Amino acid sequence: MRHYEIMFLVHPDQSEQVPGMVERYEGIITKHNGKIHRKEDLGRRQLAYSINKVHKAHYILMNVECNLDALNEIKNAFKFNDAILRHLITVQKQAITTESVLMKKEKETKVA
């Protein structure tokens, strides 16, 4: 199985449905005997440019280990979900379990 980093942007009007979406995608991965190494809800953030006249989106980041069947099923789910504005799936050489830079910055600003 290969390691992947999955980032997807959810329409801000659908923010309350994000936990259900993440649960569904986790279910797809575990159904195919995959593993989730990191899952981060980065919250609602400003977009660099508007997508379909939307200026903010809810960001979700996941690092997973899964086979091609699970990945294709997730891609298909993203494709047919209107709430997903954009998604990006990249191949990683190894499992990434450390906290992302965005989460570290967010925690630093909360402490300060």
Curated annotation (Swiss-Prot):
What protein is this chain from? Small ribosomal subunit protein bS6
Q: What does this protein do?
A: Binds together with bS18 to 16S ribosomal RNA.
What's one GO MF term for it? structural constituent of ribosome
Q: Which InterPro entries match?
A: Ribosomal_bS6, Ribosomal_bS6_CS, Ribosomal_bS6_sf, Ribosomal_S6_plastid/chlpt, Transl_elong_EF1B/ribsomal_bS6
Q: Which UniProt keywords apply?
A: Ribonucleoprotein, Ribosomal protein, RNA-binding, rRNA-binding
Under the heading Pfam families, the entry gives: Ribosomal_S6
Tell me yes or no: is Ribonucleoprotein among this UniProt entry's keywords: yes
Species for this entry: Legionella pneumophila subsp. pneumophila (strain Philadelphia 1 / ATCC 33152 / DSM 7513)
Q: An example Gene Ontology cellular component term from the record? A: cytosolic small ribosomal subunit
